[in-house]
């Protein structure tokens, strides 16, 4: 029988995450990262022992910690000793559109296929997407006591980076 490991990142709406976990069946295990910026207690109360929580990281968009928490989730799956046939990455805001049987059947029909989405940014013409890879995004991973100051500094640095000829190679 195939077994799925769901790796989930969340930062809000513990009741929704509990509904997501309840909607997916007992042929799956759940590994969850809760952003360190969020209060974990509602998630612990809502999920109990239905999930495995991994060490927490403070997450900001575009920050290196996004890679770190994904590594934590994958390490938990690999060290579980359970032979999963699939690892599925979800956010805490997702919800299944298919039945559990349809999900398992689809993966069984596509055993040799990995589903990883992406697009080529080499020829990207959308300015908002292009600047995400050509410009630096400083200050994302630094801990701040005041989110107001952090946001002001990020906006100022974004404007400065757009003016200066500093680009990633």
Where are the model-predicted features located?
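ER/Golgi luminal nucleotide-sugar-dependent glycosyltransferases, focusing on the catalytic module
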Residues: 1-169
